[in-house]
Amino acid sequence: MSHTFFNSRLLQYKSPFGAVTANTQVTWHLDVPENFGYVDPHLVLTKDRETPVHYRMEFTGQSQGANHFQVKVTPTSSGLYFYYFDLYTDFRKICRGAGAEGFLTWTLKDSWQLTVYEPDFSTPFWIKNGTMYQIFPDRFNEGVPNKEMPFADRIYREDKTGDPYFWPTEQEEGYLNRDYFGGDFLGIEQKLPYLKNLGISCIYLNPIFEAHANHRYNTANYLKADPLLGTNEDFARLCLAAKKEGIRIILDGVFSHTGSDSLYFNREGRYGPGGAYRDRHSPYRSWYDFDSGYACGYRSWWGFDTLPEVQEESPSYVEFVCGKGGVIDTWLGLGASGFRLDVADELPDAFIEKIRAAVKAHGEDKLLIGEVWEDATTKEGFGHRRTYLRGHGLDTTMNYPFRNAAIDFVRGADAAEIADRILSICENYPPPALDCCMNFLSTHDTERAITAIADEPANGRDRFWQSGRRIPLSRMEDAVRRELLAYALIFALPGVPCIYYGDEIAMQGYRDPFNRAFYDWHSTERRLRGPLANLAELRRSCDA
């Protein structure tokens, strides 16, 4: 059918660009060929899951063989809006929607998105021209060598060069993540000069609370540092030392579940006779959902019986996390500058808003990042559209869409398609959130950057296959160049680049646990460190 032109990413057709605050006037322009004949175009704007509203467009003139129309609308409340154009002719109504490549269709193909966020939404300025560095605490650097294990069921790894264990030991029914390489707070403190020279301004630490697995996502005690890392006082000293180097530290907040082996649940009995599992009168009982309908007798995270889910609506749990003297208050008081929320899209919006209030009570400069793997503006959960990126929840999110786009690009994907994916996030995210998105190539949940870029996809192959994989030396030069190109893209895009520990020396590895090896401080790989430090310096000196 006939062609009509509109491009949501060009200011001549929609202004302002992208997301807007509530009570901001938005102007749309539409071009229709003169030879189309009579046409009466309307903007159809729909707030998410509400009734569409039609706005008649005004004719503004002719030029270059096209009739020009415009309409101005001011959304008065935050939310997710969708829009398209209806064109009424002498004969019938036709549509112009996203995905139609400029052509009119009899039926709507798709709509454009308009994100409207709260006018007072702001995010910490200090993070925006800096560079983050993610550390898996057990695997970075051991400051106190030859440790005594604080619990008998932990295995100390004296050999720092081997793969993390990926099979059950003779004492285990399944792989329990109980091998420890001994990384600690002092080890991180010792490497602060190295991180400063790399251009790092913020360290993101995977969980540090007492827990009985090396990943520490099965929290045992929220108010106590894991003894293998050090004490709460050691953490405070680390924060103070980092601050002197111009580096802030944010923590991983795991609030959707605890460990079964914890002070709160205590299925294994490590913490005496109390705990929700053993004592019906435990003060923690209301945190959990006990029901014989569950395979293990209680609701657990994705069916893992070692990770009982908490009920985030429980008043006592909310108070424990968000109240005075609670988890957030304690760790921010010790010197942390914010939190990254594990599985944020599995936390209720109301709970996230309470977490935000607790974080910001320590200052508007405190940061709250959410783990979301998709476009966070359109994410659904709990039977409704999530609202956590509109100004009253998260500051920002982890930017998996950018990560996937950067890796696909250096692996040879079509540049125009990659640009479209990147621009979609830029268009949908509120600028305060976009400016501090956590942009990365690797994390503890993904393949190492160089592995994802230059090695064969695992495609479901078992851990024994993954453990033996290394990129051939003959291909390493090309692999390093591609990784650097991907990082250059990440550094150049809106948001905050984040280097996963060891990426700067081209550490390899597929997913857990192979992406969590101990940092090789004897590595002779130097091809990435200098360029990454230069990229960090360029960001720091650039106002854009």
Segments predicted by a language model, with ranges:
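Loop/helix patches that line or flank the sugar-binding groove of alpha-linked glycan CAZymes
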Residues: 127, 143-180, 374, 412-413, ...
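Active-site-proximal helices and loops of the catalytic beta/alpha 8
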Residues: 239-248, 256-257, 262-273, 327, ...
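Substrate-binding/active-site clefts of carbohydrate-active enzymes
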Residues: 136-202, 208-334, 355-361
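Short, flexible loop/turn elements at secondary-structure junctions
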Residues: 32-34, 47, 73-77, 89, ...
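Hydrophobic faces of well-ordered beta-strands that scaffold small-molecule active sites
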Residues: 131-133, 203-205, 249-251, 339, ...
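Conserved, mostly hydrophobic/aromatic
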Residues: 30, 135, 195, 205, ...
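Extracellular/periplasmic catalytic domains that process cell-envelope and extracellular macromolecules
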Residues: 124-129, 196-198, 243-244, 332, ...
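Glycan-association/targeting regions that enable binding to alpha-glucans and other polysaccharides
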Residues: 1-133, 201, 362
